[in-house]
Amino acid sequence: MSAPEEMTLKVIAHIRTAFPTKFGIPRQSGLVDSLRGEVIFTPEYRNADAVRGLEDFSHIWLVWQFSGAVRDSWSPTRMGVFATRSPFRPNPLGLSSVQLEAIEHRPDVGPVLIVRGADLMDGTPIYDIKPYIPYADCHPDAAAGFTAQTQFHHLTMVCDAGLWA
């Protein structure tokens, strides 16, 4: 028996973040640990049993859709589509590792995952959540391809306190 060539994914949750548009979102998860988000489950998964045991993990994987960057085609440039993390993909799915800060049980929406370091736009559909397992998910000797040349720059922002009044 062979697997089908296509499948339908079910949205299990949406994330609430401070980013109403794609502009300003960090390019990778974990780059800005202070960014807080809330994963709100769809009614079918608003059940404490769905997250039982997740509280024992410090990090989780979010599988999500690039809902704000959908395009029919990919235009090749310097790298092939599968050598990049571009949102313009045959299947516009994203994968983010985020810190699980807490699980709050709210009477109106059930369990809510409080996460840090998410790189997702507000309202992004979540298709799956998996625990981050350090011995299997971390590969310290992994080759980084073209990203090994990435330079990190720290910026200091100075703002007149009078502007906040």
Residue ranges, per PLM feature:
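Glycine-rich, low-complexity intrinsically disordered segments
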Residues: 1-97, 101-165
